[in-house]
């Protein structure tokens, strides 16, 4: 540890102590908050089932930066590089299309054995795993419908895929000793004016009920459902709307997933957290950055990311909110994208933990909104960066932009060889 860092740390501790904040306790709390990194940033959501296939489901990865992972070994190596540059606890979020098998496997026939390499790797890297059925980029999703499909056989195929995915998720939780959160998102919707909006939602409701009918140990597996406003090719109607899934999660007591990019551009999920928590047991967050639409840009340390983190901390939702990331930018170095986005999420959590919330809440209860605003703004100038740098130091990760040197070295030695 450098003398300069030690001095900055001591000064920062004193500054925060003056406003009633224990920085050591803040760092202890930060170590209770894993962030689930999404594997699909590493290969532009291609997966290993059919890497040459096109991405469908109304989502899009734009850009053609060289060096993307082409197989599981490369993806895991890239993830290890990213993980080494991010301090504190992490998890990995997998999609079903990232299975490994010597022979083709139908999606309704995936099994835990197809993900055993991921579990072995997760154990070695001390990671929890989360999971997602992949209801897109498949011939039976080509017309834009899956769990709400009017064709009984096609709908049953996707039901069986989600059932099989739940068993994989439970396998993760059982093997790793931490529950896997399995999120169900389907792209179902219509491009233009829709006459019957009711029937597809009724089918989706019934399909989801069948999917979650098998009782699984909550210590191993947690069900979550995710809404969306629209997707490319489904601009006019989305079966799984916010109202649909809020009702479903409330009535079935599943977790609800809020994705930062899945709402109208003027809506923010930070304002939805406290409302949802009144009705549902758990919340899954997909922190992202929508630019005009659900563009899935890399997460910044911006106002909304900070507001999301503050909601979690202010209301002590450590054990009820699961923090995941969801972005995929193919225009920049993919490892750097992981590092930037995940570090920013952790920075936002740290800044929230360094807030004198009790004091601010008292001012609010007293009706002293002048002091509330003044202190909220003044705390932005407190030396949180020194606390972050100490946190990085304790976790043997670079504190500042030095991490980029490691990414560039890896790019030159490894990524550049992939063509």
Curated annotation (Swiss-Prot):
Binds 1 Mn(2+) ion per subunit. One of its GO terms (biological process) is rhamnose catabolic process. One of its GO terms (molecular function) is L-rhamnose isomerase activity. It is an enzyme of class 5 (isomerase). One of its GO terms (cellular component) is cytoplasm. The keyword Manganese applies. Its EC number is 5.3.1.14. It is found in: Cytoplasm. Pathway: Carbohydrate degradation; L-rhamnose degradation; glycerone phosphate from L-rhamnose: step 1/3. Mn(2+) binds at residues 262, 294, 296. Its cofactor is Mn(2+). Keywords: Cytoplasm, Isomerase, Manganese, Metal-binding, Rhamnose metabolism. Belongs to the rhamnose isomerase family. Catalyzes the interconversion of L-rhamnose and L-rhamnulose. Homotetramer. This is L-rhamnose isomerase. It comes from Klebsiella pneumoniae subsp. pneumoniae (strain ATCC 700721 / MGH 78578). The lineage of its organism: Bacteria, Pseudomonadati, Pseudomonadota, Gammaproteobacteria, Enterobacterales.
């Amino acid at each position: 540890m450098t003398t300069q860092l030690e001095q900055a740390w001591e000064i920062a501790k004193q500054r925060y102590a003056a406003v009633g904040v224990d920085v050591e306790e803040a760092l202890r709390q930060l170590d209770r908050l894993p962030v689930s990194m999404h594997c699909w940033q590493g290969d532009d959501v291609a997966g290993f089932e059919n890497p040459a296939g096109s991405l469908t489901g109304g989502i899009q990865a734009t850009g053609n930066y060289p060096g993307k992972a082409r197989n599981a070994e490369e993806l895991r190596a890239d993830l290890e590089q990213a993980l080494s540059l991010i301090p504190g606890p992490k998890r990995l979020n997998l999609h079903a299309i990232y299975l490994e098998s010597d022979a083709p496997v139908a999606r309704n026939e995936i099994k835990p054995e197809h993900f055993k390499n991921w579990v072995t790797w997760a154990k070695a890297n001390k990671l929890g795993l989360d999971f997602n059925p992949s209801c897109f980029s498949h011939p039976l999703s080509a017309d834009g419908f899956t769990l709400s499909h009017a064709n009984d056989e096609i709908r049953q195929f996707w039901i069986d895929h989600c059932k099989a995915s739940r068993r994989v998720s439970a396998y993760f939780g059982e093997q790793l000793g931490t529950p896997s959160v399995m999120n169900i998102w389907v792209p179902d919707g219509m491009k233009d004016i829709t006459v019957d909006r009711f029937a597809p939602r009724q089918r989706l409701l019934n399909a989801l009920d069948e999917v979650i009918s098998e009782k699984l140990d909550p210590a191993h597996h947690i069900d979550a459902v995710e809404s969306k406003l629209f997707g490319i090719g489904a601009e006019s109607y989305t079966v799984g709307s916010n109202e649909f899934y809020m009702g479903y999660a409330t009535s079935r007591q599943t977790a609800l997933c809020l994705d930062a990019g899945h709402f109208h551009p003027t809506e923010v999920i930070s304002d939805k957290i406290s409302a949802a928590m009144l009705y549902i047991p758990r919340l899954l967050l997909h922190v992202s950055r929508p630019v005009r639409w659900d563009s899935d840009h890399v997460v910044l340390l911006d106002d909304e990311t900070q507001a999301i983190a503050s909601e979690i901390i202010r209301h002590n939702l450590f054990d009820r909110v699961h923090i995941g990331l969801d972005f995929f930018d193919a225009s920049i170095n993919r490892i750097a994208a992981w590092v930037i986005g995940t570090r920013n999420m952790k920075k936002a959590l740290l800044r929230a933990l360094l807030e004198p919330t009790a004091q601010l809440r008292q001012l609010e209860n007293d009706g002293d909104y002048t002091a509330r605003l003044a202190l909220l703004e003044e705390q932005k100038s407190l030396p949180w960066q020194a606390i972050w740098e100490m946190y990085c130091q304790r976790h043997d990760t670079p504190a500042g932009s030095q991490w980029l040197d490691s990414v560039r070295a890896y790019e030159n030695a490894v990524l550049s060889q992939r063509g």
